[in-house]
Amino acid sequence: SENEIKTQDIKLRNLPAYFGVDRALACLEALKIIKNPFQKNLLIADFGTTLSLTKLTAKGSIIGGQIIPGFLTQLKSMEDYTQNLSSPRNYKIPFQNFVINTEESMLRGVFNSLTGIINLSFDPAQDILIICGGDSELVGNRLKQKNDEIIISPNLVMKGMISHYNG
């Protein structure tokens, strides 16, 4: 339709044509909300069906990214591809790393897989991390407790869409 946003409509440096519109809009908005006084790179972690990581230089050029199964996707795959595991009914992630209860073990394992990739990819000395997406608060609040270089902005993509239309 005439109001459809296409990747090529978004003005970002080094933006590949195949890049998802949602990721591009998140980048666009992240560059607006960050006042980059230390000229740090920007790492955007969009926690949804997938966890998409996108890294930009301090000047706003896309370096690249990673895409991994998201929180619910990992839980659902355990339920679908194993015989005796069911997705937990609540998502209260235990603070202990090793737990006896199966549902809590699944939650802790998925949480550790997602935060582990963040910890491997995010260097607070060189990066500012912006966390967005539907599961951003579930995971982001635990990460933020450890670092000031983290911004949680759950609706980053939607805000990017609004910014794009308001031009």
Regions found by a protein language model. Name each.
Residues 1-42, 59-167:
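Nucleotide/phosphate-binding catalytic cleft detector across ATP-hydrolyzing
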Residues 44, 51-56:
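Short beta-strand scaffold segments in enzyme catalytic cores
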Residues 49-52, 136-137:
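Gly/Ser/Thr-rich loops at beta-strand to alpha-helix junctions
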